């Protein structure tokens, strides 16, 4: 689960992390009061969306102006102007895709007198089963570009969970960033604070970009990006309460209600598969035959008729879907259950696009019989290769 920047900073505050003061607003009419509360004389008006690259992003609407999603204001009037322009407008960044995201919240923050910018993040390293720090002197930039162009400027290390964070970890960060004296001590404290927050809240990722040194000699987190382990949210009702469903895909939200693993993609062939590995293989073979998947959907091994019906409805709710491929290998999941769910869903919502079903495994003959006797216009496939070719051909012919 992701949260907004202003929420992430609120999570970090109790751990003693050095942050700028800020006020979140939902209405442009609240901008003046927020600016006066902070005092100025410089403010930063930040779009709050679940995507990076806000500063370099562009708004779709001409009324939002030609500046990005993070703007420096030198007067209260500018704060009011930017708030009016940005709220409700659609911001397109390198991470949102061409559709962009609507800005429904702003974070108005005290401006900082910046001397240097750095990058610092913590993430779960699944190879070592440890938390890793990633540090770079190239802050305020897209870290993927830095990793590609100048990998030598990125330093990373992991923390042994048996010992936890230790003094040498902070010194490693300070050395990597070229910090000495009091700034090095601040870096040591910050590393311990961020690690404590990461562990305490079951985070998957914590990114500070940029981490800055101000001209007053203070090490400060100017931005904060967080994601949390969804499997641990039951332990953190305070974090769960921060969820902003307007930032999430409506189909993914609906899928989560049925414990379906669903991810929206930008293709045209909807997929329903059991098992993540088989789902990825199905997506790959669709791509191999010249088309792209519209989603990743793993119904899991214990799906029932209602769950399958819900999955089918979610797929058909996507207007980009021009064909559907159902690929089931019945182990724990029984093919007749899948067939019953598909037939029920088709009769309920109708079938306006080609549908190919490949069933194999437990109760496969019963499953095929249910589909055959349903009278539905469904293409049957014997194996994955056959299924992929049939759905691609059917979609092209229907176009």
Curated annotation (Swiss-Prot):
Residue stretches making up the ATP-grasp domain: 9-254
The entry's keywords: ATP-binding, Ligase, Magnesium, Metal-binding, Nucleotide-binding, Tricarboxylic acid cycle
InterPro entries: ATP-grasp_succ-CoA_synth-type, ATP_grasp_subdomain_1, SUCC_ACL_C, Succ_CoA_ligase-like_bsu, Succinyl-CoA_synth-like
Binding site for substrate: 274, 331-333
Subunit details: Heterotetramer of two alpha and two beta subunits.
Residues annotated for ATP binding in this entry: 46, 53-55, 109, 112, 117
Example GO BP: tricarboxylic acid cycle
Cofactor binding note: Binds 1 Mg(2+) ion per subunit.
Family of this protein: Belongs to the succinate/malate CoA ligase beta subunit family.
Pfam families linked: ATP-grasp_2, Ligase_CoA
Organism annotation: Rhodopseudomonas palustris (strain BisB18)
Source domain of life: Bacteria
Name of the coding gene: sucC
MF terms in GO: ATP binding; magnesium ion binding; succinate-CoA ligase (ADP-forming) activity; succinate-CoA ligase (GDP-forming) activity
Pathway: Carbohydrate metabolism; tricarboxylic acid cycle; succinate from succinyl-CoA (ligase route): step 1/1
Described function: Succinyl-CoA synthetase functions in the citric acid cycle (TCA), coupling the hydrolysis of succinyl-CoA to the synthesis of either ATP or GTP and thus represents the only step of substrate-level phosphorylation in the TCA. The beta subunit provides nucleotide specificity of the enzyme and binds the substrate succinate, while the binding sites for coenzyme A and phosphate are found in the alpha subunit.
Cofactor section: Mg(2+)
Descriptive protein name: Succinate--CoA ligase [ADP-forming] subunit beta
E.C. code: 6.2.1.5
Enzyme class, first EC level, given as a word: ligase
Catalysed reactions listed for this entry: succinate + ATP + CoA = succinyl-CoA + ADP + phosphate; GTP + succinate + CoA = succinyl-CoA + GDP + phosphate
Binding site for Mg(2+): 209, 223
A GO CC term assigned to this protein in UniProt: succinate-CoA ligase complex
